[in-house]
Structures are given as C-alpha cells and as structure tokens.
C-alpha cells in the first residue's frame, strides 16, 4: 500500500514484449512499495524481469499499464521531459559496469554530474565530490583516470556518482557482479550505510545472496510478480 511517506510505489505494473508472433508477459500486475531507510533486494533468474522492473522504477522505460509514484508524485502519465527532470532530482543509478568515461578524470566526471543535477557553484560541486570520495575511501582517486584505478575503486566512484545531489532513491542493477565476494559485500555495505544515515531508500537487483545480510527486505521475481522471502 502506497502512502504519503513511501519513497516509491509501483501499482499493478504490467509489461510485455514481442516474442516472435506472440506477446510475452514479463511483468504481471506487480506491486512494490519502498519506505524511507528501506534497502530492498530483488532476486531471480536471468530473463525473469528484474532489470525491466528496475528500468520502470527508474523512469527509463514505460510500463504498459499501472501507476508509478515516486516521492509522493504520480509520474505515470507525465511527459518524457518531466521524467528526465525527475530522474536527475530524485534518483541515483548504480550499474553492473561502472560506465565511467575513460578520457576524463574522476573528479571532473563527478563534478559534471553535479552540474547536470543543478549545482551552479563550481566550488560547491568540488566540495561535494571530494566529500563523497572521502566517505567512500577513494579520495586519492579524485585526479585519476579510470584506467589508473582498481575494479573496486571504479565501482566506488560509480557509487559516488549515484549519491551526488542527495537522491531519495538509489537503484542498483547487479552492482557487485564484477567483484569478488569480499568487495561485493563492501559495496552492499556502502549502499546500506547511505540509506540508513541519510534517510534514503534503495532497490538492488542481484544474484549474489552473500550481500543479503545488508538489506531489509528480499523479494524474488516469479512469473512476473514479486514474492517476498
């Protein structure tokens, strides 16, 4: 049940794709509510609809039907330009691949994101970025290019990018998949700390059951719906 305090509410979401001459239901009448300071994990085999669900929650993909409510705002039928604005304002994304630009230093990349999110003051952008990198233990990477960093450092930089602008909701798609188990746990713990200390929420799609100790609620995608475990 979505209430005024819920960070995100998905109600009766449906999504189908063409599969040859037929339509295949990927998401069927799915409901999900995430509250402030709640860290949710979604499990399920490849092709079960987990990433599709995350794309709908992240305003990257339209559902065929149903309602999307984020931050108390019904965003189901708004224009794409408004979706872009709300993504920048309300959401932070972490991907399996860090997707850092190889030709820009980390500090410059993150400050560019801060500018896109509305911070006009260059000194404040630099202060925010340096603060986030310090919180994540990679302050020495500020002036480095991605090819000078380890895999774990690059994923931490990607997490810093997601945290810029203080978004209400963090969406993470297999953020630990390319890391060894210990580094994967560190990444999940960093997301958990951000959620709890800064009154945010997070949804993480994962195959990695070793990180579930850091989440509050676990669901599994089954036949297009979420089953709570």
What kind of feature is each model-predicted range?
Residues 58:
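Helix-to-loop junction immediately C-terminal to a conserved catalytic motif
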Residues 66-74:
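Conserved ABC transporter NBD signature motif
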Residues 75-92:
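ABC ATPase NBD coupling module
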Residues 104-113:
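Short coil-to-helix segment of the ABC ATPase nucleotide-binding domain corresponding to the Q-loop/switch region
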Residues 145-149, 153:
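Conserved ABC ATPase signature
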Residues 164-168:
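A short, proline-enriched helix->beta-strand linker immediately N-terminal to the Walker B motif
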Residues 170-173:
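Catalytic Walker B motif of ABC-type/P-loop ATPase nucleotide-binding domains
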């Amino acid at each position: 049940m979505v209430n005024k305090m819920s960070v995100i509410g998905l109600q009766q979401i449906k999504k189908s794709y063409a599969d040859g001459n037929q339509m295949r239901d990927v998401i069927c009448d799915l409901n999900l509510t995430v509250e402030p300071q709640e860290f949710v994990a979604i499990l399920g085999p490849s092709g079960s609809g987990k990433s599709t669900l995350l794309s709908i929650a992240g305003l990257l993909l339209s559902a065929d039907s149903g309602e999307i409510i984020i931050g108390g705002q019904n965003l189901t039928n708004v224009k794409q330009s408004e979706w872009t604005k709300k993504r920048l304002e309300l959401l932070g994304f972490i991907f399996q691949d860090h997707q850092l630009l190889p030709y820009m230093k980390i500090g410059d990349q993150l400050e560019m994101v801060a500018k896109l999110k509305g911070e006009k003051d260059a000194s404040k952008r630099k202060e925010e970025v340096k603060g986030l990198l310090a919180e994540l233990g990679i302050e020495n990477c500020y002036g480095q290019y991605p090819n000078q960093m380890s895999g774990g450092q690059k994923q931490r930089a990607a997490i810093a990018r997601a945290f810029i602008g203080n978004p209400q909701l963090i969406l993470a798609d297999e953020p630990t998949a390319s890391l060894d188990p210990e580094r994967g746990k560190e990444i999940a713990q960093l997301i958990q700390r951000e959620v709890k200390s800064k009154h945010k929420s997070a949804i993480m799609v994962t195959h990695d059951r070793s990180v579930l100790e850091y989440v509050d609620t676990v669901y599994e995608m089954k036949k297009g719906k979420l089953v709570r475990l």
